[in-house]
Curated annotation (Swiss-Prot):
Belongs to the VapA/VapI family. This is Virulence-associated protein I. Residues 19-74 form the HTH cro/C1-type domain. SUPFAM superfamilies: lambda repressor-like DNA-binding domains. Residues 30-49 bind DNA. The keyword Zinc does not apply. InterPro entries: Cro/C1-type_HTH (IPR001387), Lambda_DNA-bd_dom_sf (IPR010982), Toxin_antidote_HigA (IPR013430). Keywords: DNA-binding, Virulence. Gene3D superfamilies: lambda repressor-like DNA-binding domains. It comes from the Bacteria. GO terms for molecular function: DNA binding. It holds the Pfam family HTH_3.
Length: 108
């Protein structure tokens, strides 16, 4: 499920949606079959395709070994999604008082 974006922004897309829609469905592959092929628990893949769990480095490497491609792409998708989700909670971020400009220039 994509998270709606603001004006001129791309929506946040969970990597599980990509896995489900671009890999599993077109190939007629079930989450359970993929889990078996990747030697991981079925719950891991099910949670990813249901967008309830993120892609880890380990999962990215396993997906790339099976499907081909680039592990960094899977991790970048996850990071982009995580950032979009975090940005939606601006209220908790906006209460942080930034370090003053003068203090930022001090070497530690």
């Amino acid at each position: 499920m994509s998270i709606p974006a603001g004006k001129n922004e791309m929506p946040a897309i969970h990597p599980g949606e990509i896995l489900r829609e671009e890999y599993l469905k077109p190939m007629g592959l079930s989450a359970h079959a993929l889990a078996k092929a990747l030697h991981v628990s079925p719950s891991r893949i099910n949670e990813i395709v249901r967008e309830q769990r993120g892609i880890t480095a380990d999962t990215a490497l396993r997906l790339v070994r099976y499907f081909g491609g680039d592990a960094q792409s899977w991790l970048n998708m996850q990071t982009a999604y995580d950032l979009k989700m975090a940005e939606q909670d601006k209220q908790s971020i906006n209460i942080i008082i930034p370090l003053s400009t003068d203090a930022r220039n001090v070497e530690l």
